[in-house]
Amino acid sequence: MPNWGGGKKCGVCQKTVYFAEEVQCEGSSFHKSCFLCLVCKKNLDSTTVAVHGEEIYCKSCYGKKYGPKGYGYGQGAGTLSMDKGESLGIRHEEAPGHRPTTNPNTSKFAQKVGGSERCPRCSQAVYAAEKVIGAGKSWHKSCFRCAKCGKGLESTTLADKDGEIYCKGCYAKNFGPKGFGFGQGAGALVHSE
């Protein structure tokens, strides 16, 4: 069928894609609103897309569908997964019940306003306007940094170990595989005499 309008066709809905709403991926064009994971419908971008033929996925769904089979495969360090492993017989303890407040001021207003969580890095109160959640804890935006190099993090770009958060690079260097050939990167020269 001839394309009289001259515009490219969206790889998902097959309608014309105009320049202002175009996202390109591996030679195909998409509407920004159509550039979603085929499985979970999350918005995608150049860093989160994985392509299989004509289909687009987020990296997590792509790994589950086309990656190596088995629990824990198809995801890198620091990837957040909602899979609790119940299909493998893994059981989780129930969360402890609500504990009474230790705040001596028991007014409802004081409990709502003063009962904020504490930042694991600086131990100060974290309020909603400055709260970032990562590794299951609330952090100040300014404290949400790699424990080793100080690089600012996002909830999708962190790895945690023993209650501390790291960028993926520092996590791999400090807690990744050890031994000959690891941690050198592509093109590293090894001199042996």
UniProtKB/Swiss-Prot annotation:
Alphabetic keyword roster: Acetylation, LIM domain, Metal-binding, Nucleus, Phosphoprotein, Repeat, Zinc
Record-annotated LIM zinc-binding domain positions: 10-61, 119-170
Positions bearing N6-acetyllysine: 84, 112, 131, 137, 161
One example GO MF annotation: metal ion binding
Nucleus recorded as keyword: yes
Residues with the Phosphoserine modification: 81, 192
UniProt subcellular location: Nucleus
A GO CC term attached to the entry: Z disc
Residue ranges of the motif Nuclear localization signal: 64-69
One GO process term, biological-process aspect: muscle tissue development
Superkingdom of the source species: Eukaryota
InterPro entries: Znf_LIM
SMART domains (UniProt xref): LIM
Functional note: Could play a role in neuronal development.
Subunit structure: Interacts with ASCC1; ASCC2 and TRIP4.
Protein name: Cysteine and glycine-rich protein 1
Organism: Bos taurus (Bovine)
Underlying gene: CSRP1
